[in-house]
Swiss-Prot record:
Keywords associated with the record: Phosphoprotein, Viral RNA replication
Entry note about domains: The N-terminus consists of a long intrinsically disordered tail. The central part contains the coiled-coil multimerization domain (MD). Forms a four-stranded coiled coil structure. The C-terminus constitutes the alpha-helical domain (XD) that binds to the nucleocapsid (N-RNA complex).
UniProt biased composition (Low complexity): 134-145, 260-270
Region feature Interaction with N0, mapped onto this chain: 1-48
This protein's name: Phosphoprotein
Oligomer and partners: Homotetramer. Interacts (via multimerization domain and XD domain) with polymerase L; this interaction forms the polymerase L-P complex. Interacts (via N-terminus) with N0 (via Ncore); this interaction allows P to chaperon N0 to avoid N polymerization and non-specific RNA binding before encapsidation. Interacts (via C-terminus) with N-RNA template (via Ntail); this interaction maintains the P/L complex anchored to the nucleocapsid template during the sequential transcription. Interacts (via C-terminus) with protein C this interaction allows C to associate with the ribonucleocapsid.
Phosphoserine: modified positions: 86, 151
Annotated spans, Disordered: 41-99, 134-163, 201-231, 250-273
Stretches the record annotates as Interaction with the nucleocapsid (N-RNA): 459-507
Annotated spans, Interaction with the L polymerase: 361-377, 396-410
UniProt family annotation: Belongs to the morbillivirus P protein family.
Domain of life: Viruses
A Gene Ontology BP annotation from the UniProt entry: viral genome replication
Amino acid sequence: MAEEQARHVKNGLECIRALKAEPIGSLAIEEAMAAWSEISDNPGQERATCREEKAGSSGLSKPCLSAIGSTEGGAPRIRGQGPGESDDDAETLGIPPRNLQASSTGLQCYYVYDHSGEAVKGIQDADSIMVQSGLDGDSTLSGGDNESENSDVDIGEPDTEGYAITDRGSAPISMGFRASDVETAEGGEIHELLRLQSRGNNFPKLGKTLNVPPPPDPGRASTSGTPIKKGTERRLASFGTEIASLLTGGATQCARKSPSEPSGPGAPAGNVPEYVSNAALIQEWTPESGTTISPRSQNNEEGGDYYDDELFSDVQDIKTALAKIHEDNQKIISKLESLLLLKGEVESIKKQINRQNISISTLEGHLSSIMIAIPGLGKDPNDPTADVEINPDLKPIIGRDSGRALAEVLKKPVASRQLQGMTNGRTSSRGQLLKEFQPKPIGKKMSSAVGFVPDTGPASRSVIRSIIKSSRLEEDRKRYLMTLLDDIKGANDLAKFHQMLMKIIMK
């Protein structure tokens, strides 16, 4: 099969080169077109011509070129033509004899016949013919030569398995596929096909036959259909189109009343619903409703995934909404998880605050028991409160162990030292601090908490500037006093300036 295909391709290329080298004359083309129109207008004459070819007659009223067979030399020849008739038939077409081999392939055509011999119209491309299974009632494609010279197996030769082998091209095809794929069947498939043909014996004649479906009705095809296959030689769209489905979703259309009387007993039709042209969705059938299930609903029950367009869109909308809800739920769950983490952190913060409160309470308790040291010396003798006795309850040392602290810092009175041997001896004299723990007296010529005494140091000038800035004097006077302070030199002048400044502020 592959060798035949390669030979056909080679012959076609040679014909194309010959046509380019020596084009066919316009007169020959017109005569060929006239012959083709006569064949199309007179199918009976075409059938008679092909029957004469099958019977082996040497004369042809109209040439019928083969689309399948080829000569041993590689060039296509005219069907039913003898060895010496090529020149006469070439002269009938108006083609020069020397260019017949090169130009005859340009006039090739395909003929498809059924079993009755009727020509099938509308076939433009043999590759687009879909082959169906079956032995009876199918049309056949007749295109073989009488001599079976291209057959690989002789007619009637017994097979190794015991089956009568006929021509390879006469085997019926058991599965539907294109005519161009017929030649790819090899090996066991060929033997199986030949075995089925030998058992059938339903073909009236031998030869290369193919089971093909009847040509489709162009009137029933959808006008908006797009071609599903392009031509191979002329690059024209074939007859195959996508036919729109005639099934419509909805309720069953009403049936017209039959004029004939029913032969059998009638059935009540009181619960028949009113007629509707179409319905978007058919509910499940119930005996009370009287509605019928459409074929599409039955297909759904059988397992086919067929949905009405509107129902399918509704389902898609529901799926989209569910996906959106699921996404929102995931976001809410993530936020709740973050809230749970924050709740744990808040609990830990509360625990830390409680521990800090406990620590603060402990410090408050400690501060309540701390002894405050108030020195009894260092006061100004002119102060009227200098002779006031210090509260004996105020301890002069910071500490919690008052007994140990007092024993370390207080010196015992003389009376207590004299009465050490007396167990019940008590004295009214108070204890006094040791000299190393007694504060030194405050000097009158040094700055202290009692009063400010200016000196030549920068700290004294800074204190005076602060006094000027914090006073309620006018800004002009403040600036004037600042300039005077910068011009003063010496400790005595600075002390006088300080006394003058205090008098101005106190006014």
